[in-house]
Amino acid sequence: MSRGVPPFVLLLMLSLLAAPVAAQQTHILVITGLSGDPAFAEEFHTWATTLLDAATDRYELPAENVTYLAEKTDADPARIDNRSTQENVEQAFADLAERAQPDDYVLVLLIGHGSYDRGESRFNLLGRDLTAKDYA
């Protein structure tokens, strides 16, 4: 079922990694939400790891600049840092805010399903789903 990473995602990543200023660093946070189906879970993981492999292997982004949260850590325990819950997402953003400097590049990629209710969009996570306001 995997169709690879959408080309616009790779293009965005390449533009962030291609020619950073010497003092600048790139940080990547990838969050895969609830899959709802094993086939989607596999596809989300493939998209996430394809992007992360390109960043770390091809563009030599340091592993400490990468955070990957997913629905199930047992899908790839060596690479998935934690489960994609509200608490872990908030902690990942707090950690990123501590590490990233003002001129650094930060890429946050949300892979998954969303919902829309009463005028508010949400990204589906384990537990409470987060809104755009939660990510601001």
Positions of PLM-derived features:
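Short, charged beta->alpha transition segments
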Residues: 7, 93-96, 135
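A generic membrane alpha-helix/interface feature
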Residues: 5-6, 45, 78, 129-130
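Cysteine protease catalytic core and zymogen-processing segment of caspase-like enzymes
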Residues: 115-136
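N-terminal secretory signal peptides that target proteins for export/translocation
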Residues: 1-3
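Boundary/activation segment at the start of structured domains
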Residues: 17-109, 114-117, 121
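Bacterial N-terminal signal peptides
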Residues: 7-19
